[in-house]
Structures are given as C-alpha cells and as structure tokens.
Amino acid sequence: MSHPAFWEDLYQRGGDGWELGGPAPALVDFVETGPPPRGRVAVPGCGRGHDARYLARRGYGAVGFDFADDAVRAARALEAQDPTGASFERRDIFTLGGDYANAFDGVWEYTCFCAIDPARRAEYVRAIASILKPGGWLLACFYPIRRGGGGPPFPISRSEIRRHFAPRFRFERAFPPIRSVPRRSGQEWMVLTRKTY
C-alpha cells in the first residue's frame, strides 16, 4: 500500500472498487447546502479526479494528487475532454509539505485516509496540516466507520478520528453525511475541521 506499484496494479486490473464515476454524494451535498470558503483546495488520493473536477466547477482552485500514474492520466484525460480548471499531479502525499507548505485554503479527504497503512495515520495528519494555511479547513468523509477487519479500506472509529486530528485541528462539525454511496451507507462520518495554527 505504501508503494505506487500496489495501486498501479489495482488500476490496471480494474480493481479500483472505490471508483464512483462521479463526485462523492457526501461532498456534493455539503457544498450545495453549506459550502466551505472558496480558495485553493487539495484533494489527496484523487483517483480519476471526479471530486477535484466537481470542486473546480463550483469555483474552487482544485489540485488533485495521486500516487498512481494511471489515476493521474485518467484524471487528466477527463479534464482534457471537459475542462473545469482542476489540475492533477502524481505525488506521494506524505511529501507534499516540501513543495506545498501552507499552500492550500482547504483539503477534501475521501478514501485516501482509509487506504493508507494505519501505522502511517499520524504521518498523514502531519502532511495534511503542513499543506494547509493557518486556519485552513479540512472537510473529510471518513470510511469505513467500523471496528476490526483488514484493508484497504482500513477501518476507523469516530474516537480514533478525533484522537488523530485533534492535536492539529479544531472540530467544527461532525455528522453522518446526508447521502452515501449505497454500499457505504451507515459507514461514513463527515467532519469539518480547522487547522489550529
């Protein structure tokens, strides 16, 4: 999971079961009903870029990052066919702080956190905090909310979410999403947080 080859293989074999074919319902509902402030937004683990492209259409300066070349190529191809202004880069999310320190007003997290090795979750939180401007927002839909089981996707609990993010982020809202992908219904948890420094 910590190597691009793992994800490339999944894309090449059609094992990308996380692919929705469009933006995440939880993101769409949140942006349509109470959008976070506009600005430059990072989308880590963007896959084929549907969420980043949706955010760009809604007036955000969206940049999608993914570990897998195939994902970035697919996202760029979709963007070329139907331009939204989103851009896509093949990057290791754990090293983004080197080039993007305090560069983003917001981050949208969905299915990236659950895909990484749980032993690297604290490192992920540090990486996300490093690319956000002081006071920047993190909107996340965490999945799967359950105990036990392997992955990816690796399970997480609401208490673990708070434990990992509270040292660097202030929680403003936490709630079940209005809509979920049917197979994920009851297993997702939305949070809106602010970087505390």
Regions found by a protein language model. Give the residues of each.
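Class I (Rossmann-like) S-adenosyl-L-methionine-dependent methyltransferase catalytic domain
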Residues: 1-43, 47-102, 116-197
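Conserved acidic residues
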Residues: 105
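A conserved beta-strand element that flanks and buttresses the S-adenosyl-L-methionine
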Residues: 108
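Short catalytic micro-motifs in class I SAM-dependent methyltransferases
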Residues: 111, 115
